[in-house]
Amino acid sequence: MSITPWTRGRILGGFGGPRLLFGRMYEDHGIELGVLPASPSRVLCIASAGDTAAALHQAGHDVTAVDINPVQLAYARTRLSGGASVEGAAETLMRLGRGAAGTLLPGWREDALGAFLTLDDPARQVRCWRGDLDGPGLRRLMRWSLRPGGALAMALLPSFASVVPARFDEVFRQRLERTVARHPNVRNPWLWRLFVGAEQPGAVPVHAPDVRLVQGDVVDVLERAPRGGYDAVTLSNVLDGPGPAFAGQLRAAVRHAVRPGGIVVLRSFREPGPAGAGWAAQDRSALWGVVRVVRLGANPDGTNDRRIDP
């Protein structure tokens, strides 16, 4: 097994075994649906709460969903079979943040946010964001909770705290504005999850009981797969937390398991480097600093891989 902090099944400090980390997913699977080969393709994804696996399966793909956390995988199985969503560690953090904002800031109370979330004009959304939501009170609250040494950094395990941008209070506000300036709120289920912790009205429940679920380290699963056995992999943010050794193992495993010409999708919470943010602005979830899409070439050293830009 490769070395990754995801093995613990925890993102928050404390004692005990694996916990449920994600009750819902915060990744816009519209990215994957737009770049993956035509269905039916053989796709491996991270199971998490099951949303991406369900969307890919419903689009006609042959989906294998992998998770190293047995608690998370059991939850994904239940949810994909029609079970209800429940709160994981990520939702607990978000609920506490929303509660503080709603108590201190009138614009962040649920009734006011409900009106904001029904808007369908990005230009108006930006005006409302700047005028009603992104004020001095929010900036003070985010500065207290999201900067280095703040509440979020103290709650997270060190491996995960290390990937949070140094000025995440400013970075997160910028990512939120980028999202509302580009995507209609009324058609953005991920913004509803972030702002009010609920599905938007009329949302279709997750349901894909035929998704193949595998418990294990994604590197091990890819290494055991037939060479070129997948047309695409979408790996969430599995590189957020582990060190360079894990990244190297994952790179080699992907090259083994994905055919030349196949697609790889990776996300990261980090701020983008010189290579840019990729598809992050197109991801309606608002969380990601980088969303990278790559088409694998035939050369084992990666020299003819091709980055796919929006």
Write out the residue ranges for each language-model feature.
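S-adenosyl-L-methionine
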Residues: 1-39
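Conserved SAM-binding loop of SAM-dependent methyltransferases across substrates and taxa
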Residues: 49-59
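Conserved SAM-binding motif I beta-strand of class I
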Residues: 63-67
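Class I S-adenosyl-L-methionine-dependent methyltransferase module
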Residues: 71-206
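A short acidic, Gly/Pro-enriched loop at the edge of an enzyme's catalytic core
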Residues: 223-234
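A short glycine-rich, Lys/Arg-flanked "PGG" loop and its adjoining helix->strand segment in the class I
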Residues: 248-260
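Conserved beta-strand signature within the Rossmann-like core of class I S-adenosyl-L-methionine
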Residues: 261-270
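Core SAM-dependent methyltransferase catalytic element
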Residues: 280-310
